[in-house]
């Protein structure tokens, strides 16, 4: 499974492939904890975050702390 995360100031839009599942979480402490727990349980092959002027840094740190495979990419 692969995970793509669209990062914005207040929220993270999360998309799982190939299942097509999508959900959103707040970009705050409780939201990041819930996201890390949910993704850890799913054991993705890779989580890809959009680089968005620094908003992605706390997200990347939380997911890395959960030992999730992670890539931060520039938006197209």
Roles of regions detected by a PLM:
Residues 1-76:
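Phosphate- and other anionic-substrate recognition elements at nucleic-acid/protein interfaces
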């Amino acid at each position: 499974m692969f995970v793509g995360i669209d990062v914005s100031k207040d929220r993270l839009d999360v998309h799982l492939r190939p299942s097509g599942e999508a959900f959103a979480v707040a970009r705050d402490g409780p939201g990041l904890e819930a996201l890390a727990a949910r993704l850890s349980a799913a054991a993705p092959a890779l989580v890809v975050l959009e680089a968005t002027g620094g908003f992605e840094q706390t997200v990347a740190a939380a997911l890395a702390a959960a030992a999730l495979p992670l890539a931060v990419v520039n938006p197209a």
